[in-house]
Amino acid sequence: REKIGVMFGCFSYGTRVQLADGSTEKIGKIVNQKMDVEVMSYDPVTDQIVPRKVVNWFNNGPAEQFLQFTVEKSGGNGRSQFAATPNHLIRTPAGWTEAGDLIAGDRVLAAERHLLSDQQFQVILGSLMGGGNLSPNLHDRNGVRFRMGHGARQADYLEWKTALLGNIGHSVRENDQGARFVDFTPLPELGELRRAVYLGDGKKFLSEDYLKALTPLALAVWYMDDGSFTVRSKGVQQRTQGGSGRIEICVEAMAEGTRERLRDYLRDTHGLDVRLRSAGSGKSMLTFSTEATAKFQELVAPHMAPSMEHKLLPRFRGLGTVEPRFVEPAQRLVPARVLDVQVKPRTRSMNRFDIEVEGNHNYFVDGVMVHNSPETTTGGKALKFYASVRMDVRRIETLKDGSDAVGNRTRVKVVKNKVSPP
């Protein structure tokens, strides 16, 4: 068996490869003309998508069939399309997977433009804890739409937040009561965040990792969105010098377990004396002691909007230093849903093509990350056989602790079981 190689997959002539100059070219043309080009390739060491040279070209003769894939994307017509042999390796969030093992609904990794700076991501994290929300893109496109809205009296605050996200396309509308809403263009980089926060029960779920990621800017946005401040003393007497008061922040939109996690996070991470209580309206509130109020306001004061300084003690006002920070757009990997897999109708030429890419051994076809490999490896690396089992995992219900989602009940079915020679 030493002379038998392992077969790898290929693509049909018309599958478009992403070149380093931003254009695309048919893989068949690249191979037939042995084009000296650079393609975009993912570097796992730097976690960046970078240009790499094509160092080999393969026309591996006729294929029995090609699978035609349609994958969601944010731009253009909202679709990525390519045709591969069933044994070609496609990158998924779980690793490399043969094309023939993918079905509609599975997710693959695709290159999408990222626009958000770290500062902007914190604004969104804080807004989600408050009045902001994420909604899915329509028409099966990749991307998530961030939206925020405020009443007429908070118009200046809404403008301040919108300016921090000023490089993201958006539209503004106003309702009959004067409230304004800002809808941002869908961003693929927020897809995983939406999946983590919205579990289907109508309440926001914030994990330990979400809370650990929060900076004082995110906490400030949360406080400005949903917090209220009541002055207890104006600081005339020496023991209350500088004034004192109490913060309350509404947490009704959060799941019950999330409220407790948030309370514990504020206690353990920031040393704040906070407790949960139910207000007269039945809404859940997070209440700060006078000492915790001063400590929290000192933490968030440099990140407060000028129009929200009435939520600060006098000694913490005028300290805001937040300026918009934008970054250059960059291509990054995001999960993208497979919308459809079909056997491609036979064409006059059924030849299969592949390229070899310097260093990283991967490239992108219409935005989707795929493995590069020659049709065969050296025979010494051949395996005796492959065992491939595909299990279909379906969520059938959400497990809850009170009203907090803590897990899922799933049903698993073996849908493909094959043992075959290479």
Swiss-Prot record:
Entry keyword annotation includes Cell membrane: no
Domain of life: Bacteria
Name recorded for this polypeptide: Protein RecA
Biological role stated in the UniProt entry: Can catalyze the hydrolysis of ATP in the presence of single-stranded DNA, the ATP-dependent uptake of single-stranded DNA by duplex DNA, and the ATP-dependent hybridization of homologous single-stranded DNAs. It interacts with LexA causing its activation and leading to its autocatalytic cleavage.
TM segment ranges: none
Stored InterPro entries: DNA_recomb/repair_RecA, DNA_recomb/repair_RecA_CS, Hint_dom_C, Hint_dom_N, Hint_dom_sf, Homing_endonucl, Intein_C, Intein_N
Family: Belongs to the RecA family.
A molecular function GO annotation: single-stranded DNA binding
Stretch forming the signal peptide: none
Location, primary (coarse class): cytoplasm
GO BP: DNA recombination; DNA repair; intein-mediated protein splicing; SOS response
Keywords in alphabetical order: ATP-binding, Autocatalytic cleavage, Cytoplasm, DNA damage, DNA recombination, DNA repair, DNA-binding, Nucleotide-binding, Protein splicing, SOS response
GO cellular component: cytosol
Protein modification: This protein undergoes a protein self splicing that involves a post-translational excision of the intervening region (intein) followed by peptide ligation.
Localization of this protein: Cytoplasm
Tagged with keyword ATP-binding: yes
